[in-house]
Amino acid sequence: MNEPKYKRVMLKLSGEALSGEKGFGFDFDFTKEISEQIKKLVDMGIEVGAVVGGGNIWRGRSGSEMDRTTADYMGMLATCINALALQDSLEQLGVNTRVQTAIEMKEIAEPFIRRRAMRHLEKERVVIFASGTGNPYFSTDTAAALRAAEIEADVILLAKKVDGVYDKDPHKYDDAKKYNKLSYIEVLEQGLQVMDSTATSLCMDNDIPILVFGLDEPCNIIKAVTGEEIGTLVSNSK
């Protein structure tokens, strides 16, 4: 196995990733597979922060008849459910894990405190950041970019159900072209589906590379961290 390319990483997992092939709820076997890869990262000496989405439970935009702010807060609570599920999965493997939330709920998690989060990472604890930024109208992608900047992560590992960034939906178009490398500006100008524009701009301003890859292949998280050429790398230099 190659040596780690990064010392501190931010892993962004969509809620759908935790649902596996089900598309809704939890696939505990698949969540365990993700947790086993995270454990290997910790064993390699890599400090791991994670942000989880909530799309396997609730998608704010799907509640089109609801008040947007209320729908977004419901989505934030969904991320907390996912964070606790991932924490439990990791702790069953013996990985020390902390959940920090942007909305205080001290009975189940710590409030987000930057210095405490960084201290946990230095002590080889995985830190899962839940409830997004704590504000409506901001996605969990933006939360991942924000927390990555705050904890001074070397990279955002954007784990998706697609193995990289394409010029169009590869599930719909057989001639979809995959990119190996992109600049932030190209992503923004072409409207490519990586992160939303707020998150992408935040990464660009803070020079945080984004590695987009699929979870469909075993050990892809390990491959991403050890520098194997998988997925699509988005950075300031193409």
Swiss-Prot record:
Family listed: Belongs to the UMP kinase family.
InterPro entries for the chain: AceGlu_kinase-like_sf, Asp/Glu/Uridylate_kinase, Uridylate_kinase, Uridylate_kinase_bac
GO cellular component: cytoplasm
The reaction(s) this protein catalyses: UMP + ATP = UDP + ADP
Record localization: Cytoplasm
Chain positions recorded as UMP binding sites: G54, D72, T133, G134, N135, P136, Y137, F138, S139, T140
Residues in coiled coil: none
Regulation: Allosterically activated by GTP. Inhibited by UTP.
Protein's job: Catalyzes the reversible phosphorylation of UMP to UDP.
Gene3D superfamilies, A to Z: Acetylglutamate kinase-like (3.40.1160.10)
Keyword Nucleotide-binding annotated: yes
EC number: 2.7.4.22
Description of how the protein assembles with itself and partners: Homohexamer.
Pathway this chain belongs to: Pyrimidine metabolism; CTP biosynthesis via de novo pathway; UDP from UMP (UMPK route): step 1/1
Name of the gene encoding the protein in the UniProt record: pyrH
Chain positions recorded as ATP binding sites: K12, L13, S14, G15, G55, R59, Y166, D169
Pfam families: AA_kinase (PF00696)
GO molecular function, one term: UMP kinase activity
Protein name, UniProt field: Uridylate kinase
Species in which this protein is naturally found: Clostridium botulinum (strain Hall / ATCC 3502 / NCTC 13319 / Type A)
GO BP: 'de novo' CTP biosynthetic process; UDP biosynthetic process
Transmembrane stretches, start-end: none
Region called Involved in allosteric activation by GTP, residue ranges: 20-25
Cross-referenced SUPFAM superfamilies: Carbamate kinase-like
Enzyme class: transferase
